[in-house]
From Swiss-Prot:
Described function: Catalyzes the NADPH-dependent reduction of L-glutamate 5-phosphate into L-glutamate 5-semialdehyde and phosphate. The product spontaneously undergoes cyclization to form 1-pyrroline-5-carboxylate.
Species of the source: Wolinella succinogenes (strain ATCC 29543 / DSM 1740 / CCUG 13145 / JCM 31913 / LMG 7466 / NCTC 11488 / FDC 602W) (Vibrio succinogenes)
Similarity field: Belongs to the gamma-glutamyl phosphate reductase family.
Gene behind the chain: proA
Lineage: Bacteria, Pseudomonadati, Campylobacterota, Epsilonproteobacteria, Campylobacterales
InterPro entries for this protein: Ald_DH/histidinol_DH (IPR016161), Ald_DH_C (IPR016163), Ald_DH_N (IPR016162), Aldehyde_DH_dom (IPR015590), G-glutamylP_reductase_CS (IPR020593), Glu-5-SA_DH (IPR012134), GPR_dom (IPR000965)
Keyword Cell membrane assigned: no
Protein name (record): Gamma-glutamyl phosphate reductase
Length: 411
């Protein structure tokens, strides 16, 4: 492990000093290589799927694991889009001249070696590797065991392009020891690794947080809420509920809980019921919502659960303050939305809700680097320091101060 990480650290200088044009050429070559290797990648992914099904994996986890032609094409296209993004390095973030004439610039630089720990989705391998490469970083990737063959295939394709361009293959590499013990070692290797980014469930986040001596940016669960205020426009609210819950229930920016003001709950839920029935949504509700929607009684645990399935908690609240209190208790600081035509209530919601992304009259499904207009992301950070929300290439940089003098000495 130590020898492997030492090579990764050594590779960081070569990657950090590449010219932007050269970096983009290599990324485009990687995208082409992914397309050309489609058959090989799909064959090994089929083996992963077969083994996962035999081990009892099902539902959203299988959906995340599965690759097909369009997904491979999407992976390649994402790499090309990353190549087209503005160079995140060497940006003068701030600059000033102090009284003694020193000119100071705050300039963006690579972080160094980034360890990324994730589950199920093989496309995360290509996305995160490309983002790290574009931002001048070396990445050490640890995917889920269920996607082992798929991740190895994708990484090997990208490494072959590095090798063909006389660059160290350690710039994009998979952690050689993917066991729990291996992860525990990785997150303590602060002499070689500069940042750890875990994205996954509670168990993974807790394990990394408890064991790491390296700075961690958490990409925790998405316990997202949609609140229907008493002054909501139903024509907006109804399709937003359906989109936010049912378009892709397995993703972290899908809602898990719907909150509805008591003054409008009967009218609104009666209109919503046939739409949810059409989508086959399972309801877990409070006493008032169950009278209209049917379903099971929601438990305390349900409100703390990221289902990743087409299951929706529904709770009727007395008003704005109770909705905010519920979100504060059960939310994971990911994405929260209010539907209202009341401007002052909307502004209060935006100011008072503590989350990385807060919406008015829109679906939480937009919390995504591509939808925000800055390309693919490493994940959605629920941490508050350094990066929050979709973590793109700019969040994969740090900064240094460049100081220009003309012989000044401190007195």
């Amino acid at each position: 492990m130590e020898a492997f990480l030492q090579k990764a650290k050594q590779a960081s200088r070569a990657i950090a000093t590449l010219l932007p044009q050269r970096r983009n050429e290599i990324l485009r070559a990687m995208a082409g290589a992914i397309r050309e290797s489609q058959e090989m990648i799909l064959n090994v992914n089929a083996l992963d799927l077969k083994e996962a099904q035999a081990s009892g994996l099902k539902g959203s986890m299988l959906e995340r694991l599965a690759l097909d032609g369009p997904k491979i094409a999407g992976m390649a296209r994402a790499i090309e889009e990353i190549a087209m993004l503005r160079n995140p390095l060497g940006r003068i973030v701030d600059g000033w001249v102090v009284e003694n004439g020193l000119r100071i610039e705050k300039v963006s630089t690579p972080i160094g070696v980034v360890g990324i720990i994730y589950e199920s989705r093989p496309n995360v391998t290509s996305d995160t590797a490309a983002l790290c490469f574009k931002s001048g970083n070396v990445c050490v990737l640890k995917g889920g065991k269920e996607a082992k063959r798929s991740n190895e295939a994708i990484a090997s394709v990208m490494q072959a392009v590095l090798k063909a361009n006389n660059l160290p293959i350690e710039a994009i590499s998979l952690l050689p020891d993917a066991s729990r013990e291996g992860v525990a070692k990785l997150v303590k290797m602060d002499q070689y690794v500069d940042l750890i980014v875990p994205r996954g469930g509670n168990a993974l986040i807790s394990f990394v947080s408890e064991n790491a001596t390296i700075p961690v940016i958490k990409h925790d669960k998405g316990l997202c809420h949609l609140y229907i205020h008493e002054e909501a426009d139903f024509a907006k609210a109804l399709p937003i509920v359906i989109n936010a819950k049912t378009q892709r229930p397995s993703v972290c920016n899908a809602i898990e809980t719907l909150l509805v003001d008591e003054t409008i709950h009967e009218r609104f839920l009666l209109e919503l019921r046939p739409l949810l029935e059409e989508k086959g949504t399972e309801i877990r509700g409070c006493e008032k919502s169950l009278k209209i929607l049917g379903g099971k009684r929601a438990s305390e645990e349900d409100f703390h659960t990221e289902y990743g399935e087409n299951i929706l908690n529904v709770r009727v609240v007395k008003g704005f303050e109770e909705a905010l209190e519920h979100i504060a208790i059960y939310g994971s600081q990911h994405s929260e939305s209010i539907i209202t035509q009341n401007h002052s209530i909307a502004e209060r919601f935006l100011e008072e809700v503590d989350a990385s992304s807060v919406y008015v009259n829109a679906s939480t499904r937009f919390t995504d680097g591509g939808e925000f207009g800055f390309g693919a992301e490493v994940g959605i950070s629920t941490s508050k320091l350094h990066a929050r929300g979709p973590m793109g290439i700019n969040e994969l940089t740090t900064y240094k101060f460049k100081i220009y003098g003309e012989g000044q000495i401190r007195k």
